[in-house]
Amino acid sequence: MQLFHLCLIISCTCPTFQASKLCLGWLWGMDIDPYKEFGATVELLSFLPSDFFPSVRDLXDTASALYREALESPEHCSPHHTALRQAILCWGKLMTLATWVGNNLEDPASRDLVVNYVNTNMGLKIRQLLWFHISCLTFGRETVLEYLVSFGVWIRTPPAYRPPNAPILSTLPETTVVRRRDRGRSPRRRTPSPRRRRSQSPRRRRSQSRESQC
C-alpha cells in the first residue's frame, strides 16, 4: 500500500498521467475483476503461466495488425475492441509514469521499486488482458472460455493422469465443429425419416398404376 500511495502522489503531480481510476485500481491489486463481464475471472486467467503470454509489444503489434481500423475508429465496435483500446491506452500512460518517476525521483531505491513493479507485476496483468481480448476477437469468446477451463483442468490434474501436452487454443474450434457434425449426422445415417417413407409410397403406387394402364 505504501507503493500505491506513493504512485498516487506522483500521478497527481505528473501532468501527463491520465490513466483511468478503474485501470489503476485493478493494476494495483484492488478488488476489481475486469474479466467478469466477459464470463471469465482473474483466477481463471491465473491458471496460465506467466511465460505463456507474449510481451506487451508483441501483443500490441498483433492487435494493431489485426484490428487497427476498429481500434482507431471513434465508434464503438464491440466490448472487446473497447477493452483492448483502453488496455493499450492504460499501458502507455503507465509507461509515461514510469519514465517520469525514473527522471524525477531522487531516491534510487524508490525509483527502482516503482519502475520494476510497473514492468513486472503490472506488465503481466496487461499482457493477460491484451491476450484475452485479442483471443476473443480472433477465436470467439466461447472458445477462449472453453480453453481456459480445459487448461485449468489439465494443469490441476496430476501428471500421471493427464496428457503430456497442454490444450492448444487454435485446435479447439476444429474439435468443437467435428463434434457437432458427428452428433448431427449420425442419426440421419442410421434411420431415415418416416416422412420420406410416406412420401415415397404414393409415388410408387402412381407409377405402378400408370404402368398397368399402359
UniProtKB/Swiss-Prot annotation:
Q: Which GO terms describe its biological process?
A: microtubule-dependent intracellular transport of viral material towards nucleus; symbiont entry into host cell; viral penetration into host nucleus
Describe PTMs of this protein: Phosphorylated. Cleaved by host furin.
Q: Mind naming one GO cellular-component term on file for this protein?
A: extracellular region
Renumbered residue ranges of the record's region HBEAG:
25-27
What segments bear the compositional bias annotation Basic residues? 178-207
For the region 3 X 8 AA repeats of S-P-R-R-R-R-S-Q, what residue ranges are annotated? 186-208
Which interval of the chain is the signal sequence?
1-19
Give the domain of life: Viruses
* UniProt cross-references to HAMAP family, sorted A to Z: HBV_HBEAG
Similarity annotation:
Belongs to the orthohepadnavirus precore antigen family.
Its biological function? May regulate immune response to the intracellular capsid in acting as a T-cell tolerogen, by having an immunoregulatory effect which prevents destruction of infected cells by cytotoxic T-cells. This immune regulation may predispose to chronicity during perinatal infections and prevent severe liver injury during adult infections.
* Identification of the protein by name: External core antigen
Q: What is the organism of origin for this protein? A: Hepatitis B virus genotype A1 subtype adw (isolate Philippines/pFDW294/1988) (HBV-A)
Gene symbol of the encoding locus:
C
